[in-house]
Amino acid sequence: MVSRSYSNLLELASGDSPTFGRMNRQIPRIMAVAGIMSNIDNDSKDTDLSPKDRIIIVANELPIRAQRRVDGNGSGSSSSSTCCSKGWNFSWDENSLLLQLKDGLGDEAIEVIYVGCLKEEIPLNEQEEVYQILLESFKCVPTFLPLDLYTRYYHGFCKQQLWPLFHYMLPLSPDLGGRFDRTLWQAYVSVNKIFADRIMEVINPEDDFVWIHDYHLMVLPTFLRKRFNRVKLGFFLHSPFPSSEIYKTLPIREELLRALLNSDLIGFHTFDYARHFLSCCSRMLGLTYESKRGYIGLEYYGRTVSIKILPVGIHMGQLQSVLSLPETERKVGELIERYGRKGRTMLLGVDDMDIFKGITLKLLAMEQLLMQHPEWQGKVVLVQIANPARGKGKDVKEMQAETYSTVKRINETFGRPGYDPIVLIDAPLKFYERVAYYVVAECCLVTAVRDGMNLIPYEYIVSRQGNEKLDKILKLEANNRNKKSMLVVSEFIGCSPSLSGAIRVNPWNVDAVADAMDSALEVAEPEKQLRHEKHYKYVSTHDVGYWARSFLQDLERSCGEHGRRRCWGIGFGLSFRVVALDQSFRKLSMEHIVSAYKRTKTRAILLDYDDTLMPQGSIDKRPSSKSIDILNTLCRDKGNLVFIVSAKSRETLSDWFSPCEKLGIAAEHGYFLRLRKAVEWENCVAAVDCSWKQIAEPVMELYTETTDGSTIEDKETALVWSYEDADPDFGSCQAKELLDHLESVLANEPVTVKRGQNYVEVKPQGVSKGLIARRMLSMMQERGTLPEFVLCIGDDRSDEDMFEVICSSTEGPSIAPRAEIFACTVGQKPSKAKYYLDDTTEIVRLMHGLASVTDQITPV
């Protein structure tokens, strides 16, 4: 399919779209024709994750270390883990999560290709050579960015605007995060576009899976989906996602949301982050989501975007191998000599020098501990490892200065010769050195005020498990080597929900953190062992391999419907999205239905009212004069039987449609029926006892009082609780609770409780819009005028009964042979209807077209 946008889906309603021959399975160095894909859009094969398939992992940085050669005379030699060019040495970055992810999948399981930037700037004249070396030796595709562009993209938009906002920092003043700068946003978009071009060079869209990582590349899914409508695309956000109240301050909020929704699967570390994302989609885009069989799905233009909630894990094998290194053992011995021999207990903090890590708050809590519990003075040491800051800016420098001054003040107050209560290590440490500190520390403190996953607690737990050699160094008795560990973790980090045995704290409450530190020191040994055992069991079974395999399995499942749907790209720029429809579900063409209308003589037309003829959210619900004129014109043709089918009361509908003499009306979902204005209303079902209202109404009143914006409508035979004007999230939550409550208290009553779009309704059993459709067809059959043309339009779950009756009647005697059947829903969504129109504007336009034809064939 040619990669282009369509602003009018009618152009493609017939399914005629250009196709091209299947691409060769071999991956080309550069795509021969940019933007042209294979005929996978017409390929119905299922998605199977086989050993021959590949994953293209895309991130801001490649898992590669690049070092300039001093002699510059490399011969291009290489090994399994290193490679040399004339000017550079390249090797794997063993600490990179992306490389650990590959190891977790297994060497033989699937081929992995990496796309990303190098940490070092490569001169222009060396880029082609470096590209070839990394592609051939490491299966890495480097993305070379000009320094100025990279600075504006990474240090500008990513670190000054997205990063603070995603960590709940609003730019209320120039000192509190960067104000929105559109030039930085343009740089961000440009870099994402460059990444898309790089992926195009190696992707085989028919088979490859693409997995994008983190907030640096949030608009990349749009560029890939625009090129290949059926690309198998996953995205994982490693940072927090803010609440809707924070996120909606972002000027490009909708662009980012729509870009992410071009993925098939979106992953988050915690339910809180996913919940915030779903809330933003609901409030800003009006999307709905549901949980089905354990999976959360967002309906977006006919596609289901799946939501994955699973925290990342650590690489167990790598950490265990580091624990076994002689260097680690020597370092552990040194630390025991320095602290253990002096009878001092080590508390450990390991954080980046970052404004969100809460280092200063941790130091203040240590100060509070020593003040409130002087018995710990001289006995407890807080070792704070401060990794170099990743970001730049005034706030980072101020935080560093505050950290140093706080450490100095506390050590001067509580220190003594040979004892400093706080040891600050701000020089870079090798990984084995950090692991040695984990092994010796009795408690690990993570007090970030906002963070993504944070794997420090996981590393600490596995390090405390140790091995036999370390047990000997620690002088653990052979018959009593039960391991123990203690964790004090912030409530605001991604790993907190997974660590049920940790002491959780609000890092802003310094007193509470100090109390938690004291509790961790006082916990009995057996309890420390139980907590450690519980944590180690979880961490060891939910490692990075488990995380990667689980994500890819869900990505495969999410892409399973690709081959069975027709896809069209619509929109321009970052508003681009793909409409995915079932093969039998298509947009209702004006030309098609008008042609059928002209060919036929007897017609049945059933129209829902709310959100079908009347736009959703309208304050004045009365039909417009234009709608009245259209209905009167259609009713003027003696071959037409036209019905409005609504949940409204008969009094309301009688008033609204009083100008329509020949219009049929079905009120309260079909309980009441009137063939035309001159005849009396009749009941479609036997008279019912409405004494159940005495039970249901007090329940609804309770929820109305507690849900601002909700109302109750008391009809003759039904009660409706509406939350159209309430907060969408709270209203939906209350509706679910109300539904359960009503079903419980009305279990023995002859009623059904239904939930529709922004309402919960209680009505008599057996009453449905399908009943009206069946009655209408029966009346025409009794008159001997079988309908040759049937049009049924609705937007709600209640209208599905009409669609089912209309579509199934083709096999019965109530419809003429070869009748033209048009069951049409509003919007692209799962439905029993075969057609759709986008909104009420298109519906009114369609009805106006039919009325114009009626004027031609039935003059006044």
From Swiss-Prot:
Reaction catalysed by this enzyme: D-glucose 6-phosphate + UDP-alpha-D-glucose = alpha,alpha-trehalose 6-phosphate + UDP + H(+)
UniProt enzyme class: transferase
Residue span of region Glycosyltransferase: 53-557
Expressing tissues: Expressed in seedlings, leaves, stems, flowers, siliques and roots.
Modification sites for Phosphoserine: S5
PTM entry text: Phosphorylated.
BP terms from Gene Ontology: trehalose biosynthetic process
EC number: 2.4.1.15
Molecular function GO labels: alpha,alpha-trehalose-phosphate synthase (UDP-forming) activity; trehalose-phosphatase activity
Function of the protein: Regulates plant architecture, shape of epidermal pavement cells and branching of trichomes.
Family stated for the protein in its record: In the N-terminal section; belongs to the glycosyltransferase 20 family. In the C-terminal section; belongs to the trehalose phosphatase family.
Assembly description: Binds to the phosphopeptide-binding site of GRF/14-3-3.
Record protein name field: Alpha,alpha-trehalose-phosphate synthase [UDP-forming] 6
Lineage: Eukaryota, Viridiplantae, Streptophyta, Embryophyta, Tracheophyta
Name of the coding gene: TPS6
